[in-house]
């Protein structure tokens, strides 16, 4: 499933990055020290954290995309860093739980 497919399933907004990427797995969490050891390459990372530290962790862990839940807005300095580092970021009005259930249903074709 591509990020474009995910965006459509979530009625999310692309903040920056490449929608053609294909994800593999999902990680949900806001504690950055934990995310550094848990987010895997090509995962979707669902969080409400929107500062430059999230982008710094993403440059180390290489998720397919970061999805900001609950209409969280990516801070301007974080957006600039994401663009400079090729990090794909989306924002969604949905809760982290609802994002997970919709992604799961979309993957299963439900």
Please tell me what each predicted stretch does:
Residues 3-43:
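N-terminal first-folded block
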């Amino acid at each position: 499933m591509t990020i474009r497919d995910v965006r459509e399933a979530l009625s999310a907004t692309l903040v920056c990055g490449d929608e053609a990427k294909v994800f593999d797995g999902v990680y949900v969490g806001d504690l950055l020290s934990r995310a550094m050891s848990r987010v895997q390459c090509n995962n979707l990372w669902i969080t409400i954290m929107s500062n430059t530290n999230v982008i710094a962790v993403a440059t180390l862990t290489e998720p397919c995309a970061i999805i900001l839940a609950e209409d969280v807005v990516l801070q301007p300095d974080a957006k600039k860093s994401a663009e400079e580092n090729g990090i794909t970021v989306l924002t969604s009005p949905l809760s982290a739980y609802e994002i997970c259930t919709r992604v799961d249903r979309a993957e299963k074709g439900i």
